[in-house]
């Protein structure tokens, strides 16, 4: 191998040149470093100078602004000074006016001091009057308390008296209702007695006239024809005259209003009296002696029920009038039924008149004196009215069931008659409550 020097070319620089170059590079690097450090210092100084310039500019702006503010303050102070001077002028004028008012007030004060003596005298007089008024007020308070005590006593007394009056009114109402019940019961008893009398008389007359019925047939037909020609309104005044003959029963003026108040009858009294006519037609037969036959032409298979009323078989459903009057003309039967219907209507109206007479007072009249109760109790009513017994009604019901063949069904007419029997007392109570 060859060393470093063996292969070196001829004509090249030695390593000294390299060293010189390295030295030059080091010197240049040192110079660059020094120059760069100096440049940095200069830049810092320039930055500081710029900051100072900015601060000085800010301070200058502040000073200028403060200067402008001070100028404005000077202007405002000048204006305030001018305003204060004007206010001072006004206050001086007011002060002069107040001084004038003070002088006038002093004059008024002197006058008021002069008037104080008079006012003190007036105050003393008013105090005396106040004491008198207080005494009067206390006295009136005592009187007011006394009046209140008397008022409470009077109120309690009034309540007690009103309670007693209410109790007395209740007792009087109870007595009045009892009197109405008694009068209704008396009316029913009298009606039953009259019915018994009339039934006994009718039984006797039928026994006597049973033998001479064929002779009286023409007269009966003539009487029926005459009654059919008469208007139905002729029967109502007749019943009214009968009531007037019996007396007013301590209630004058009721009879004049009877016909105008027929519409006030309960529904049971306003029903057509068909059942009453049938009952009267059967009643004439029920009181015949059970031992005698009704007529010679009575069929042998006819029987008499347990009430004494003759019954009919289903094979002979003839009317009781045909049995009573044998051989009579069939054309006269409607007239006889019409006559019986009119007579029943007349009896019903007379019963209504008696019911109205049994009341203590009328709707359009003042209450009747209780002393007239004896007159009402002594009133016997119309002797011509005919009552109805429950046994007769049951007999009529049995007779109607046998004629109709309904096998024991209830009869509407019998219910109506029962309702009619209970109507007088109930109607009197209801009418009395309506008047109260």
Swiss-Prot record:
Q: Which residues carry this modification: N-acetylmethionine?
A: 1
Compartment(s) of residence: Membrane
Signal peptide residues are none
| InterPro entries per UniProt | GOLM1/CASC4 (IPR026139)
Residue stretches of biased makeup (Acidic residues)? 399-418
**Membrane topology, from the record:** Single-pass type II membrane protein
Coiled-coil ranges from the UniProt annotation: 35-198
Which residues are modified to Phosphoserine?
233, 275, 328, 332, 366
* Keywords tagged on the record: Acetylation, Coiled coil, Membrane, Phosphoprotein, Signal-anchor, Transmembrane, Transmembrane helix
Q: Locations of Basic and acidic residues compositional bias?
A: 225-247, 344-362, 426-436
Tell me where it mainly resides: membrane
Residue ranges, Cytoplasmic side: 1-14
Q: Where is the composition biased (Polar residues)?
A: 305-321
- One CC-aspect GO term: Golgi apparatus
Q: Where are the transmembrane segments?
A: 15-35
Q: Does the keyword Coiled coil apply?
A: yes
Region Disordered, as annotated, extends over 225-436
PANTHER family per UniProt? GOLGI PHOSPHOPROTEIN 2/GP73-RELATED (PTHR15896), PROTEIN GOLM2 (PTHR15896:SF7)
Q: What protein am I looking at? A: Protein GOLM2
Q: Which organism is it from?
A: Homo sapiens
């Amino acid at each position: 191998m060859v060393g470093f020097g063996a292969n070196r070319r001829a004509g090249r620089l030695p390593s000294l040149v390299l060293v010189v170059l390295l030295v030059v590079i080091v010197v240049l690097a040192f110079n660059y470093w020094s120059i760069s450090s100096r440049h940095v210092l200069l830049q810092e100084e320039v930055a500081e100078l710029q900051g100072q310039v900015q601060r000085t500019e800010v301070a200058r702006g502040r000073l200028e602004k403060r200067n402008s503010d001070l100028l404005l303050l000077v202007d405002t102070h000048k204006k305030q000074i001018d305003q204060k001077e004007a206010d001072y002028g006004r206050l001086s004028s007011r002060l002069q006016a107040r001084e004038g008012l003070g002088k006038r007030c002093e004059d008024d004060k002197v006058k008021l001091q002069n008037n104080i003596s008079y006012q003190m005298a007036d105050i003393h007089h008013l105090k005396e009057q106040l004491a008198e008024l207080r005494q009067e007020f206390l006295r009136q308070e005592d009187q007011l308390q006394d009046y209140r005590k008397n008022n409470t006593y009077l109120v309690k007394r009034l309540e007690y008296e009103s309670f007693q009056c209410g109790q007395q009114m209740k007792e009087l109402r109870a007595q009045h209702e009892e009197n109405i019940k008694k009068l209704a019961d008396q009316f029913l008893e009298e009606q039953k007695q009259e019915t018994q009398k009339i039934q006994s008389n009718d039984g006797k007359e039928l026994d006597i006239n049973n033998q001479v019925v064929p002779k009286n047939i023409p007269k009966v037909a003539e009487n029926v024809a005459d009654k059919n020609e008469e208007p139905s309104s002729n029967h109502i005044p007749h019943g009214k005259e009968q009531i007037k003959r019996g007396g007013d029963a301590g209630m004058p003026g009721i009879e004049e209003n009877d016909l105008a108040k027929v519409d006030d009858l309960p529904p049971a009294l306003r029903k057509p009296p068909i059942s009453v006519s049938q009952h009267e037609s059967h009643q004439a037969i029920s009181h015949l002696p059970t031992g005698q036959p009704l007529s010679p032409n009575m069929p042998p298979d006819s029987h008499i029920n347990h009430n004494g009323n003759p019954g009919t078989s289903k094979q002979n459903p003839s009317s009781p009038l045909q049995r009573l009057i044998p051989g009579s003309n069939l054309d006269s039967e409607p007239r006889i039924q019409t006559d019986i219907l009119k007579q029943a209507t007349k009896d019903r109206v007379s019963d209504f008149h008696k019911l109205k007479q049994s009341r203590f007072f009328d709707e359009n009249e003042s209450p009747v004196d209780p002393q007239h109760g004896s007159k009402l109790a002594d009133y016997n009513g119309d002797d011509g009215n005919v009552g109805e017994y429950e046994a007769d009604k049951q007999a009529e019901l049995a007779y109607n069931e046998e004629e109709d063949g309904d096998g024991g069904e209830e009869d509407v007419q019998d219910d109506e008659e029962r309702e009619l029997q209970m109507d007088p007392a109930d109607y009197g109570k209801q009418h009395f409550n309506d008047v109260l």
